[in-house]
Amino acid sequence: MRGEFYQQLTNDLETARAEGLFKEERIITSAQQADITVADGSHVINFCANNYLGLANHPDLIAAAKAGMDSHGFGMASVRFICGTQDSHKELEQKLAAFLGMEDAILYSSCFDANGGLFETLLGAEDAIISDALNHASIIDGVRLCKAKRYRYANNDMQELEARLKEAREAGARHVLIATDGVFSMDGVIANLKGVCDLADKYDALVMVDDSHAVGFVGENGRGSHEYCDVMGRVDIITGTLGKALGGASGGYTAARKEVVEWLRQRSRPYLFSNSLAPAIVAASIKVLEMVEAGSELRDRLWANARQFREQMSAAGFTLAGADHAIIPVMLGDAVVAQKFARELQKEGIYVTGFFYPVVPKGQARIRTQMSAAHTPEQITRAVEAFTRIGKQLGVIA
C-alpha cells in the first residue's frame, strides 16, 4: 500500500511534467532587486517580483532590520499570547491600523494565515460568505474552513453580486460578508469597491478586502484600493501582507474594528498557534511605513515606470490586460507560446514567468509583468525591445 502511494506521486509528477505544468524553481544568487544574478552567473532584469516600491534590498530597511535584531533578538520562540509579544509588535500593529484608517490590526505569519484564520473565527453556519470568483487561493481556502453558506459571483460583476446577496438574505442568513481581492493579481485589475460597498450598504452586509497587491502604492497616499476607490471607512476588514510592496520579506495582518481584532486574538488558530513575527521583520516593517508616509517619490517612480512600459508595449502591438496598476499582463493565449516566450526573454536578460492553465483560464496564457520603482527607464526600454524581437519571431506581433 505504501509503495502504491509513492508510485502514485511519481506518476502525478511525470504527468505534470509531460503536460508542461511542472513548476521549476529558478535559483537567484543575489539579493532581490531590479538587476538580479541567477544560478549560471548571468545578470537579468527582474520583471516578475512583487517588489513594487523597490524596497526588498533597500539599505535603510536592512539597517532597521539589523537594529531590530540588536535590540530585540533574532526570534521570539513563542506564540503571541504566551511570551511572544514585544513592544515593537504592538507598535507595528498600531501603525498599520492608522495607515489603513482602521481602528486596530493584528499580525500574522503571512497573509495566507490571516485569510485562513479569518472566516471560521468570525462566522458560523447561520451566516453567508459571498466571494469573488477570482479571489486569491488564501481566501478560497479560508472560506472552505468556515461553516457559513458559500456563494460566488463572477469577477467584479456587480449585477451577479447583488443576485447572490438577495439569495443569501432570502435564505435567512444572519450575517453576510462579501469577500474580494482589492487587486486581482493575474489581471492587474482593481476591484470595484465602490460598487461592492454600495451593495453592502443596501443589503446590510460586511465587506472584507485582501489588499496585498495595493497597500503601499495604490491610492493617493498608498493606503490601498479602498483609498483609490474612495471608500475608506466603508470597508470592514482589510487583510494584507508585508511580503510585497512593504519590504518584501514576510508577515501578514488583518485590520478592522477593535472588537473584530480582539476576537481574532482570542480565537484565530493561525494566530494562536504560530510563532510571532521575527523582530527584524517587525523593525523593518515599521521603517517601511515611515518611508511610505514620508513622501510619494517611490510611488511616483513606480507609476512612471508602469506608464512607460504600457505605452511602449501597446505601441509595439501587444495586447495588455489590466489598467491603473503595476501588474501588466502581456496576453499571449497559447500556453506553449507563453512558456517559450518566457524562456527566450531570459536568454535576452529579461526575467519573467509565463502563466497558463490551471493558473489562468485555458486560452488566456500570459506573461505577467510587474513594474517596480527600482527599474530605470533604460531597463524598461530594454525589456520592451526584447519583447518586441521575440514577439515578432514567435508571430505574436507583426
Curated annotation (Swiss-Prot):
It holds the Pfam family Aminotran_1_2. GO terms for cellular component: cytoplasm; cytosol. InterPro entries: 2am3keto_CoA_ligase (IPR011282), Aminotrans_II_pyridoxalP_BS (IPR001917), Aminotransferase_I/II_large (IPR004839), AON_synthase_class-II (IPR050087), PyrdxlP-dep_Trfase (IPR015424), PyrdxlP-dep_Trfase_major (IPR015421), PyrdxlP-dep_Trfase_small (IPR015422). Its cofactor is pyridoxal 5'-phosphate. It is an enzyme of class 2 (transferase). One of its GO terms (biological process) is L-threonine catabolic process to glycine. It comes from the Bacteria. Belongs to the class-II pyridoxal-phosphate-dependent aminotransferase family. PANTHER family: 2-AMINO-3-KETOBUTYRATE COENZYME A LIGASE, MITOCHONDRIAL, CLASS II AMINOTRANSFERASE/8-AMINO-7-OXONONANOATE SYNTHASE. Homodimer. Catalyzes the cleavage of 2-amino-3-ketobutyrate to glycine and acetyl-CoA. This is 2-amino-3-ketobutyrate coenzyme A ligase.
